[in-house]
Amino acid sequence: MNLPTVLCIIALILGVRSAKNGFFTKLGKPIVCDDINFVGNYCQTKCVKAGANNGFCCQQKCYCLGLNDYAPTLQVADSSEKACQAMSG
């Protein structure tokens, strides 16, 4: 067998997991964070519960980091997405 074939087989066995960032949605609506829960770990808790690695409040919505590819996310303008990605470090 050649090397690419072996690498593909190993990847399938290990189960390659991809991650994405975005505003997680539940029933088509984003998780809202307002002035009361902007500070603290409200969004982190909500995002981790949704399967993400982390999360924070950005533009009054919870922005999740490390969601799986199949997690539903809100479609937003590129400028909004870039602003939240910049805040994530």
Swiss-Prot record:
Disulphide bridges: C33-C57, C43-C62, C47-C64, C58-C84
Record-stated family: Belongs to the long (4 C-C) scorpion toxin superfamily. Sodium channel inhibitor family. Beta subfamily.
Entry's localization field: Secreted
Keywords associated with the record: Disulfide bond, Ion channel impairing toxin, Neurotoxin, Secreted, Signal, Toxin, Voltage-gated sodium channel impairing toxin
Domain comment as written in the entry: Has the structural arrangement of an alpha-helix connected to antiparallel beta-sheets by disulfide bonds (CS-alpha/beta).
All copies of domain LCN-type CS-alpha/beta, residue ranges: 20-85
Tissues in which the UniProt entry reports expression: Expressed by the venom gland.
Keyword Membrane applies: no
Residues in the signal sequence: 1-18
Name recorded for this polypeptide: Neurotoxin LmNaTx28
GO CC term (a single one): extracellular region
Organism: Lychas mucronatus
InterPro entries, per database record: LCN-type_CS_alpha_beta_dom, Scorpion_toxin-like_sf
Gene Ontology molecular function: ion channel inhibitor activity; sodium channel regulator activity; toxin activity
Domain of life: Eukaryota
Biological function: Binds voltage-independently at site-4 of sodium channels (Nav) and shift the voltage of activation toward more negative potentials thereby affecting sodium channel activation and promoting spontaneous and repetitive firing.
